[in-house]
Amino acid sequence: MLLNIGDKAPNFTLPDANGESVSLSDFKGKKVVLWFFPKASTPGWTIEGQGFRDEFKKFESKNMSILGCSADPPSKQKKFCDKQNFDYPMLCDESHSMLEDYGVWGLKKFMGREYMGISRVTYVISEDGLIEKVYDKVKTKSHALDILDDL
């Protein structure tokens, strides 16, 4: 189940693409855009990530940090980040614990097949660590700009 506006965002510590530990608490006093994607280097998620990359300075000017997260291992995330020149942390939750805490890991259905996976969801977390916005219907090409327009 997804988190709701006003909920406290669960803290986490996960490795990023470089194997460095990143915690939500590292960003206290800043808003955080936390976007989840099913798999690194796939077309839709690449477009979504490029949007955040291209608008990175605008997010920074609003005192906001961007974090991406999937269940990919750091080595795969690193290739993805390096190829796309992503300037923001891409987190790796291979155990799915944080993905579960945020309600984005669960049963999915596609073409008559059921499997466990990550839902495409983005949260905006306030400076105080509360869920400020929930995006569960994402348009990959315009998602970053849609968030900027909302804030």
Segments predicted by a language model, with ranges:
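Chalcogenol-based redox active-site neighborhoods
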Residues: M1-L151
